[in-house]
Amino acid sequence: MTRDSIETAYSFLHQKRYVYIHSRLEWQRDDIEYAIAAYADTMSPELFGHLADGKKDFLHDHNHFEEDISKAVCLLEKMLNI
């Protein structure tokens, strides 16, 4: 996993998380969940594995999405020493 892949993931997830947690529009939140799940499917497998920590439906489960994206952003911040 490269620093560039970590920075890219952080930029995308941080921005989408901010909009997601402040949005009250269900269609917008659904669109963000879809975009993040699609991004996760193309993410570096090593990076995704580190973030998911064995959770198979990480960033793909509607019921745990806010928790998952918050965890991912937190871990990425630690990896980048932010």
Show the residue positions of the predicted features.
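Amphipathic alpha-helical binding modules
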Residues: T8, G54-I82
